[in-house]
């Protein structure tokens, strides 16, 4: 083996080792900013039951672009948590900022909500300079009869095709959706009686 061949082999081995040991950067959704206006008065309570995102987005590699059916994925950055969990967490927090924390229940709270809320994202896709959002949502009243469903479609500006920009745009999109949902809660507050049962 010639010295030149040995040197080339050593450089190749070092390059492979460097690639194998390159750390993966993790990115998380930032918290939603506080709204300019909020409904802090009494009102119906809401439990965010289920949030789903498309399966192609609900994995750890960060999708930074989409053109048609072709996805562009970051090769060095992953989500710090499964996207469906992060989306639900940030959306729940954004709702609590708009409706008051006491009105947005969490699993295991022990109280019966006035409304169950389900959200299905059909798209939460980074495209050319925008994050495209298409979400179906449904409120179901738990005491009185009634429900309300809708579909929200809009675009949020995307600063760049990078994981950090995608995370920031996703949180902005969730805050905008929370504005819509907070104004759409259809159910009246559950009426509780203050009377104590009579002991015979």
What are these regions (language model features)?
Residues 52-55, 94-99, 125, 178-181, ...:
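Sec/Tat-exported extracytoplasmic proteins
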Residues 99-105, 183-200:
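Surface-exposed helix-capping loop/turn segments at secondary-structure junctions
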Residues 84, 88, 92, 96, ...:
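Extracytoplasmic/secreted envelope proteins and their assembly/folding machinery
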Residues 1-19:
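Sec-dependent bacterial lipoprotein signal peptides
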Residues 19-81, 113, 189-200:
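A structural "domain/chain start" motif
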Residues 20-37, 97-143:
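Surface-exposed short loop/turn segments
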């Amino acid at each position: 083996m010639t010295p030149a061949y040995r040197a080339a082999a050593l450089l190749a081995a070092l390059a492979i080792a460097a690639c194998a040991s390159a750390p993966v950067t993790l990115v998380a959704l930032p918290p939603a900013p506080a709204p300019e206006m909020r409904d802090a008065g009494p009102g119906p309570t809401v439990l965010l039951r289920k949030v789903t995102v498309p399966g192609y987005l609900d994995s750890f590699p960060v999708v930074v672009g989409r053109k048609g059916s072709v996805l562009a994925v970051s090769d060095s950055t992953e989500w710090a948590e499964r996207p469906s969990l992060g989306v639900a967490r940030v959306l729940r927090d954004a709702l609590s900022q708009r409706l008051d924390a006491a009105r947005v229940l969490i699993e295991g709270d022990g109280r019966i909500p006035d409304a169950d809320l389900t959200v299905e994202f059909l798209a939460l896709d980074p495209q050319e300079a925008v994050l495209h959002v298409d979400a179906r949502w449904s409120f179901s009243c738990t005491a009185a009869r009634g429900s309300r469903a809708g579909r929200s479609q809009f675009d949020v500006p995307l600063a760049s095709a990078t994981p950090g920009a995608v995370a920031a745009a996703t949180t902005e999109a969730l805050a905008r959706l929370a504005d819509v949902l907070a104004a759409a809660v259809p159910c009246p507050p559950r009426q509780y009686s203050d009377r104590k049962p009579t002991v015979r």
